[in-house]
Amino acid sequence: MMCEVMPTINEDTPMSQRGSQSSGSDSDSHFEQLMVNMLDERDRLLDTLRETQESLSLAQQRLQDVIYDRDSLQRQLNSALPQDIESLTGGLAGSKGADPPEFAALTKELNACREQLLEKEEEISELKAERNNTRLLLEHLECLVSRHERSLRMTVVKRQAQSPSGVSSEVEVLKALKSLFEHHKALDEKVRERLRVSLERVSALEEELAAANQEIVALREQNVHIQRKMASSEGSTESEHLEGMEPGQKVHEKRLSNGSIDSTDETSQIVELQELLEKQNYEMAQMKERLAALSSRVGEVEQEAETARKDLIKTEEMNTKYQRDIREAMAQKEDMEERITTLEKRYLSAQRESTSIHDMNDKLENELANKEAILRQMEEKNRQLQERLELAEQKLQQTMRKAETLPEVEAELAQRIAALTKAEERHGNIEERMRHLEGQLEEKNQELQRARQREKMNEEHNKRLSDTVDRLLTESNERLQLHLKERMAALEEKNVLIQESETFRKNLEESLHDKERLAEEIEKLRSELDQLKMRTGSLIEPTIPRTHLDTSAELRYSVGSLVDSQSDYRTTKVIRRPRRGRMGVRRDEPKVKSLGDHEWNRTQQIGVLSSHPFESDTEMSDIDDDDRETIFSSMDLLSPSGHSDAQTLAMMLQEQLDAINKEIRLIQEEKESTELRAEEIENRVASVSLEGLNLARVHPGTSITASVTASSLASSSPPSGHSTPKLTPRSPAREMDRMGVMTLPSDLRKHRRKIAVVEEDGREDKATIKCETSPPPTPRALRMTHTLPSSYHNDARSSLSVSLEPESLGLGSANSSQDSLHKAPKKKGIKSSIGRLFGKKEKARLGQLRGFMETEAAAQESLGLGKLGTQAEKDRRLKKKHELLEEARRKGLPFAQWDGPTVVAWLELWLGMPAWYVAACRANVKSGAIMSALSDTEIQREIGISNPLHRLKLRLAIQEMVSLTSPSAPPTSRTPSGNVWVTHEEMENLAAPAKTKESEEGSWAQCPVFLQTLAYGDMNHEWIGNEWLPSLGLPQYRSYFMECLVDARMLDHLTKKDLRVHLKMVDSFHRTSLQYGIMCLKRLNYDRKELERRREASQHEIKDVLVWSNDRVIRWIQAIGLREYANNILESGVHGSLIALDENFDYSSLALLLQIPTQNTQARQILEREYNNLLALGTERRLDESDDKNFRRGSTWRRQFPPREVHGISMMPGSSETLPAGFRLTTTSGQSRKMTTDVASSRLQRLDNSTVRTYSC
């Protein structure tokens, strides 16, 4: 049988059809029909395969039965034939009659068996040929399938892309074909093995059959020969019979003596031969029966072989069909693979295109943000130009009035008109540029929309990347687990190091005792110096003014108080003096030429420093009248002609002070070596516990500078703790005490957080800001900090003293701001050592000691290692800063004309900026004009404020002050004078009743000057974090709000991005709660006292739910009988404004937050009833007639706020006057009448869309 090879699938035709766009649908329909046919063929092939396998198993079983029967018959033949032949030859020789027809029948049967065997051999050869053909067909089909496997896979991918819901089963077809190949290969191996075994058995049977045929032929010849001899004669028969007998029988013959045979023996022998012949005939009959049974069995075996051959033929046909189908499937598979390759290439190109589009989108967003920032800057500049234009117009009118009497003013007027014309031209250019920028902004918005449309194409790729991200997250989790184990081992090592640090602390305490002893010696020397001063004062001038004696007494008191209070503060390293400002020096010609070389060099340094009087002033507000005296104002007192004795005494005192300085310097070096060892241990602990914190290595013997660069100050600004320091005047000691906490290791920083609140109660001058890197604490955790024992805090302070070394500060690279910060202590030290030496007459002797004290403490002051000073000194400095601001108020100076010290005082007292930002502004900002002209990027680059919310706070405050101090600003109604500024006495009178309360809150206790002067003056970040957020039920975000210094100015400018990224408020419900809290503040016009008054009035009554806090809501829930569920809304954001203003917040939402089970219907009914009563009695919401479950705002809410409504902000009479100019939004009465009930929804939509407000505070 020849193998019919199926024609291969033409691959060019479908590809060419796909290439043409017109015939695409025909190829798809053809391919679908082909796939349907393949599925049908697959089903039929599977059915036929099952049938063939069943028939093959039956044939194999029958063949095994036949082989077993054949083996049994063969054994019978082997056991029976040799004996039968021997007996047959013996019996036939002696028998008289035989049965020739039986032998003929046996011969015929043998011939028939031989013919049947030949036929079977032919059939077996045909079956072999058919099996070879089947194998060839299978191989051909496998080749076709492998060739078309790629095209089939491409088709599958295409169909899946077209209709993802209805995925076809081509993949299953391919899998079935592959399994069919494997099955047929295994089946072919089994058939080959069985055929080989069968052939071996057949060859063995043929050999046995040939041997049996030879034996039968020999028996047949013997039978013929016997019959011939029996037919000849009887005698001859006997003789032949005797000859044919065996030799053993002849031995028994007996002959007579005369040679004849005995007759009795002959008869007995004949009888025996007859018996043998009968026995042989019987056995011959049995053999015939056996042969007949064997022939019938052979016939059955032939029939079974015929059926097996037919089954094999069917199997080969099915195999051929399977091979044909498999070849077709392989061709389709190759086609699909080609399609898949094409789609993969398209996918890669699309992926690259989406990546480029995404990059372009990011670039466009950045450009858009920059354009918006530039646009805002242009608007600000435009507003400033308009203000300048108004000022110029006013001046022009005044000039025109004076023109009649003052003709020389006309020239000046002409100049101003020219300047005004130039300003108008610049204004016109700016407007044109703004229009151009608006056009560009519209184009960018269009490009952004197109980019967002293209960005949607990347979603599928992002989904695929999510699996990879999950895998990476699991790997990172494993790495973090390993890292955690390493951290635990490091903690054990840290405990050992802490024990070592305790020993170093003891050594430090011993050094502190030595320092106290030295302080006593210094006190003794001070008394001696006082005596010397009295003597020298009597020699120089007998009469000393009383004021000067008071000044010297004040100095003695301050120095003595420093020495006495030295042991109270463990973190103090050296003796501190009250910090003094750098005095101004006039450039006068020196009148004394007889000074020593050392003093003359110092005088030259003072002259050089006096050429830059305000370049790097650290604290200009500290200048007093005594310090304003210059070095050369009293040079005539030290001329050689009149006062040589005083000069000699001064030189002697200077030598004694130098000796004292050397001795103290040696003691300090010994103490610093002990502190350096403790610092090394602290650095080791910090490197183990906090890997990301870069602590500077300690280098013994190096001089430690007092400043940190502006960038490092801004980037490492610590978040506020439980209570940030009260807004007292910041000394460098307290500034660096705040910054020193940042350099602590993580475990010590946590320890310091616990003791910050307790230390604040007893030591107001030691308040620190703790770094809250841990999750936000809850109010319960905050209350627990007040129960710590005092001894525990004392131990903590003593253990923390070793970590406040100046080397632990992160000193950045040197830049201009750092250099300017370095100049202040150096100038002050030189001034104190020379200027006070040659001061007034009553300070001639005492100036040496004061110069020594100031020289030794100057470098220590900026690092915050000593106490602030006496209370009188603090009050004096605070008064100086108040006087600076009051002077600006009296002169009516705009903000742009403020000098550097006034701006710094404003930042500290009015704005309440932290010390690190104040220091950066002091170094970089020299006037209000520079401050007001700074843009957002310039604030970040020049001052180093990296936090965008900090920059927003500063910009809003600057805009507020610019609008308040401009000449066009209207007077306010909160102060008696009608101005935003009030005098120090007026403000003290206003703030006297509220001073106790403010001191408890810790925000403006030390600075009562600016209470209630602005709408947001009493709502700084302290109030927001400590009071307002807990009242909203969101105390967990307190640390983030305090870290970002969020005050009331900033609340209306916070976007969704700010809340999510910087303030970590990712919960949408919490953002909604915050927004309704802001709306409540707007309704109250940001009046803190009004809010507190209304809350106090509604403490025990169900009314005015708008101002209810989270605690008040909890108490209401407890009062209605749901005490067990009340605490579940702690830190949930549920407060009165949310209940009163949110139309979507009903009793079911409250029940969900209270975690009341749904099966507890009684509690839910109680809550529903009481909640409805609460809405009816305490809010402006009322039941809707159509649905009792939904509420809407009634029409009576406008009566509470009759004057006007601006975007949901209630403006009470006179309240708009207290707002800055940027907050006075104009609106018509029609707009106020159109105010609808969807105020809350519009607010929330604005917040969720992350829009940026254009008006500013």
From Swiss-Prot:
Post-translational modification Phosphothreonine, affected residues: 237
Coiled-coil regions listed in the entry: 29-154, 185-541, 643-695, 1081-1107
Biased composition (Low complexity): 16-26, 709-725, 798-813
Protein name: Liprin-alpha-2
Gene: PPFIA2
Tissue and organ distribution: Expressed only in brain.
Subcellular location, principal: cytoplasm
Note on domains (UniProt): The N-terminal coiled coil regions mediate homodimerization preferentially and heterodimerization type alpha/alpha. The C-terminal, non-coiled coil regions mediate heterodimerization type alpha/beta and interaction with PTPRD, PTPRF and PTPRS.
Compartments where found: Cytoplasm; Cell surface; Cell projection, Dendritic spine
SAM domain span: 898-964, 1020-1084, 1108-1177
Region annotation Disordered: where it falls in the sequence: 1-29, 231-265, 438-463, 709-738, 790-834
GO cellular component terms, A-Z: axon; cell surface; cytoplasm; cytosol; dendritic spine; extracellular exosome; glutamatergic synapse; postsynaptic density
